């Protein structure tokens, strides 16, 4: 594997998880963020993800990975659109009911999720559209990084396909280490599902829709079920 690919995997496996946990510690040490602070957080995260995508795409294409290998080409357009929309609706519904369940629970995990929601999820109208832009960015950029580049790079080595799916899911879970152990497990399992779907469809498009849909629902259902109604406006 080329040296620059190793650097990218170092970014995915070490730098991004460390950065996420460090940012979360700083956020949790502060009182709940105001609208301006949330908008700055959303904008900085959007910028970071698009810069990461551009840098990784530059090195991937420069090293000979093709758009097809990266999941950027597809032949069955109708099937992919239907799969994307149906999957987004199904996973979004699951996210909705899971957050409703968490909102009724007590204990360390629900309390951590409430603190996280209080600081990063939109609670006012002015915050919602920028949050949706962040959700779409995460859907596009993270799917390219983990199901596009990482799977393509590993598949060019002697790593078996089943292990490629597990390794990239593990990296995806670590990227969400700021959510705690349950967050790592949940996103890791979602990463396995997305990795298998990537193999089935040969395209990132369905997973991008699924990922964005799950995050958008989190921005709607999270404040509704995890925070008191008085905090939303």
Show which residues each predicted segment covers.
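N-terminal, membrane-interfacial amphipathic/helix-forming hydrophobic leader that caps
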Residues: 1-73, 78-79, 162-163, 219-233
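Transmembrane helix-loop-helix hairpins at the membrane interface
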Residues: 8-19, 114-233
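Alpha-helical transmembrane segments of multipass membrane proteins
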Residues: 15-17, 48-52, 87-95, 194, ...
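Short helix-terminus and kink motifs of transmembrane alpha helices
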Residues: 18-26, 96-104, 148, 152
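Hydrophobic membrane-targeting signal helices
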Residues: 20, 57, 61, 95-98, ...
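N-terminal start-of-chain detector that recognizes signal peptides
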Residues: 29-31, 40-43, 105-111, 144, ...
């Amino acid at each position: 594997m080329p040296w620059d690919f190793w650097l990218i995997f170092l970014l995915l496996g070490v730098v991004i998880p460390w950065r996420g946990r460090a940012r979360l510690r700083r956020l949790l040490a502060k009182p709940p963020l105001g609208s301006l602070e949330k908008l700055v957080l959303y904008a900085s995260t959007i910028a970071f993800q698009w810069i990461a995508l551009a840098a990784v795409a530059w090195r991937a294409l420069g090293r000979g990975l093709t758009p097809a290998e990266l999941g950027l080409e597809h032949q069955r357009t109708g099937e992919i659109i239907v799969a994307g929309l149906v999957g987004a609706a199904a996973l979004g519904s699951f996210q909705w009911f899971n957050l409703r369940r968490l909102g009724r629970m007590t204990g360390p995990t629900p309390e951590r999720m409430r603190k996280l929601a209080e600081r990063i999820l939109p609670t006012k109208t002015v915050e919602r559209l920028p949050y949706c832009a962040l959700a779409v960015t995460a859907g596009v950029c993270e799917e390219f990084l983990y199901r596009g580049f990482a799977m393509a790079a590993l598949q060019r080595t002697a790593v078996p396909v089943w292990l490629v799916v597990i390794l990239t899911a593990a990296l995806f879970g670590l990227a969400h280490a700021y959510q705690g152990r349950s967050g790592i497990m949940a996103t890791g399992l979602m990463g396995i599902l997305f990795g298998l779907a990537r193999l089935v469809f040969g395209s990132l498009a369905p997973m991008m829709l699924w990922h964005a849909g799950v995050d958008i629902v989190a921005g709607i259902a999270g404040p509704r079920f995890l925070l008191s109604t008085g905090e939303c406006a």
